[in-house]
Amino acid sequence: MIVSLLAGFMLVFSMIGAISFSPLPIFIKAQIPGSPQGWHAVHVGAMMNGLMAILIGVIARWFVLSDRAAAVVSWGTIVAIWANVCFYVFGMFAPNHGLSLQSNGLGHANLAGAIAFLPAFIGAVTLFAALIVLLLAKPSSTAAS
């Protein structure tokens, strides 16, 4: 959620073209990297990741998980969250939006696109692993309470 808050500030700064701490009389003209649309995606995406983590944490309590299974769910979710943050931030600077390692219909490939794509791919795999562990887990006898 802290990443979402920081991205929200970057969104505001990119929209007004300056760093401002209103109501303080501080207004520093600055060219903020990225675009308002990109910072909006980082802001909302990071917030959704935080909500996903909370939801998975709540749902995991409904199942009997071994230490190893709990670790897969926990680390799979953590890796996915930070991988998504990389995707949102670096995808903003990639002409292909970080959706592939090569050029695509959206634009050409660059380093930012690769830095966006690779962690996101790994995060998708770890999140699938976490969700599969939860789907295969036995319900807890205290799940209803």
PLM regions: where:
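Hydrophobic cores of alpha-helical transmembrane segments in multi-pass integral membrane proteins
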Residues: M1-I16, G38-A60, W75-M92, P119-L136
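Short acidic alpha-helical/loop segments enriched in Asp/Glu that coordinate divalent cations
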Residues: G17-S22, S66-A69
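Membrane-interfacial segments
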Residues: I19, V64, P95-L99, K138-S145
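Perimembrane loop-to-helix junctions flanking transmembrane segments
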Residues: F21-Q37
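Membrane-water interface of alpha-helical transmembrane segments
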Residues: P33-P36, H40, D67-S74, N110-A120
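Cytoplasmic juxtamembrane regions at transmembrane-helix boundaries
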Residues: A60-W82, T142-S145
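Transmembrane alpha-helical segments of integral membrane proteins
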Residues: F87-N104
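Short, membrane-exposed interhelical loops at transmembrane-helix boundaries
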Residues: L99-I115
